[in-house]
Structure formats: C-alpha cells, structure tokens
Swiss-Prot record:
The keyword Coiled coil applies. Residues 80-112 form a coiled coil. Residues 73-83 have a biased composition (Basic and acidic residues). This is Uncharacterized protein DDB_G0277209. Residues 62-72 have a biased composition (Basic residues). Keywords: Coiled coil. The keyword Coiled coil applies.
Length: 124
C-alpha cells in the first residue's frame, strides 16, 4: 500500500471511531430509552448507507440511476420490473445449467470407474 492509501484507511477508521464515540457518549441509562436510542441510531445508519449507495451509482449513466431506483423502490412501470426479473431468471438458469453439467460429468466419471472395476474383476 502506498502512503495515500494508508492515509485514506486511517481517515476511515477515525471517522468510524467518532461515530461510535458519539453513540456511546449519548447512550441513556434507562433501558426503554436505550432501546429507542439504539433503534433510532440503527435507522439513521441504514439511511446513510442507502444515501451513499445512491450517490455512488447516480454518478454514472442514466441507466444506472434507473436500475438502482428500481432496486430500492417499487416502480409503477411493470415492463421494467419484468426485464429486471427476466435477467435474474436467466442468471438462475445459467447457474442450474452449470450444476447440471457438473453432475453429468460426475455421473460419467462414476460409470467409467464402474466399468474399469468390472474389467479388473474379470481379469482376476
């Protein structure tokens, strides 16, 4: 790692530690208040993560904007959802085909072993 990457990593760690220091600094003593505070803190963290993901993807092309929006929010345009679902199905089909090929190769290998065992037994 070069020096700039190390500095970036240190800054990330420092920012994370500041967040947790703030979190534990304001932690109430009452159990009910503590639960509410933790739930609120978790919700804000999720919102911040979502905003960061959106910022990263929105810098790209318009297609990226539309795809990330569809992932986070249900769209009224059913055709776009169908396209998104069909891509998922295509990926699943490809995965299943790969698994099928692996199983077929294993079966063929086992058949060859069985045949070789028969030949060896006949020789003995």
């Amino acid at each position: 790692m070069n020096q700039q990457e190390l500095i970036e990593e240190i800054n990330k760690i420092e920012s994370c530690s500041l967040v947790f220091e703030r979190f534990f600094g304001y932690l109430p003593n009452d159990i009910k208040e503590r639960k509410q505070y933790i739930l609120k803190f978790n919700k804000t963290l999720k919102d911040e993560k979502r905003k960061l993901k959106c910022k990263k993807t929105f810098k790209g092309e318009k297609k990226n904007k539309k795809q990330t929006f569809l992932k986070h929010h249900q769209s009224d345009d059913h055709s776009e959802n169908k396209v998104y679902k069909s891509k998922k199905l295509e990926k699943k089909i490809q995965q299943l085909n790969k698994k099928k090929q692996l199983i077929d190769t294993k079966i063929n290998f086992l058949k060859e072993i069985k045949e070789s065992n028969k030949i060896n037994k006949s020789k003995i």
